[in-house]
């Protein structure tokens, strides 16, 4: 919306706060993102063309690489992961959850440290982790969103992405994503690949990789 009007245009209209946190709303671009997902799942050549068009519209019109005061959706930066572990800045559509209920439901699974008796806790072995994250020195998902687990018999890493910490930026805490910006890049890349446009597909994947701190050597 702010692509058509200055933010000041909405100040009077926004007295009730409706336009706040629009990346939680099922707004126009969230619908286009959902279209892209559904068309790709359908899988026919015609639907993949529609999926590509919808995903590209979201990427080109709704996304920005520059952080401004009124930015709706943008890439996570290096320093953002500490405040927004669920990557809220990249959400196109999501849920605002009750943190107490969520913590109670996930207490057995999402932990920052585990003992041998924490049988339900989610953790990743060292081998699995290093196989997934090809560059553990620079990949933000590795350096920012995993906690090393060195005690007990289950040595590995614990995921922090959905763990709500006291240090998280409160305006963007307690959020669970349903549609995120990187998915639009993946959908568009898959559609380009279906059209044998490997270069376009790789360009899109490279954008996501670079934004995660993964670079081609």
Model-derived features: positions:
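Acidic/polar-rich alpha-helix caps and helix-coil junctions
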Residues: 1-109, 115, 131-217
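N-terminal segment of the mature soluble domain
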Residues: 119-127
